[in-house]
Design a protein with these regions (language model features):
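A generic "binding-loop/recognition-motif" signal
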Residues: 38, 49-50, 68, 84-85, ...
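Short acidic-glycine-tyrosine-enriched beta hairpin
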Residues: 67-83
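Short strand-coil-strand connectors
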Residues: 27, 64-68
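Short, conserved beta-strand element in jelly-roll/cupin
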Residues: 33-37, 46-64, 101-104
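Ligand-binding loop in jelly-roll beta-barrel domains
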Residues: 62, 82-110
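A short, N-terminal "cap"/entry segment at the start of jelly-roll beta-barrel domains
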Residues: 1-29, 43, 109-138
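Short histidine-centered beta-strand/loop micro-motifs
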Residues: 21-23, 42-48, 89-91
């Protein structure tokens, strides 16, 4: 059995950006951890082909989209599409930590396979055809 898995540790103390994509050897989408110091803002920018999703992990982000500010708190997400200008800003007195994900092209859809347990052999089945396992005993 070939195993294709990578692991890394997020560093919330990083100066500006941790390029997680490289650390995990990802090719199909980008993922970056971004830390904005109080009062810091990034460049106004756009992407030609990729959607970008921002997930706020800590603090309050002001995401400016085509000149309109949108405030996002912890556990809130925003998507900005290709060709749309955006700027990430932190007008607060606390740092902001964001996970940014970007991808171009179309989503592959449901390409998952599932097994009942680790001992099951074969190519796997559609996930909806495999019942969820019982909860772990507490």
């Amino acid at each position: 059995v070939s195993v294709d898995a990578s692991y890394t540790q997020l560093d919330r103390g990083v100066e500006l950006m941790q390029t997680v994509r490289r650390e995990l050897d990802l090719e199909s989408f980008g993922i970056n951890l971004m830390v904005l110091r109080p009062g810091q803002r990034l460049r106004v920018h756009t992407h030609e082909r990729q959607d970008e999703v921002y997930l706020v992990l800590e603090g309050t982000l002001t995401l400016v989209v085509e000149g309109e500010p949108h405030e996002l708190g912890v556990d809130q997400l925003a998507r900005v599409g290709p060709g749309t200008r955006r700027q990430l800003t932190n007008p607060t007195a606390a740092k902001v930590v964001i996970l940014a994900l970007g991808a171009a092209g179309t989503h592959e859809g449901r390409d998952a396979r599932a097994w009942t347990d680790w001992d099951e052999e074969g190519p796997g089945r559609e996930p909806r055809d495999v019942p969820l396992p019982e909860d772990l005993p507490v």
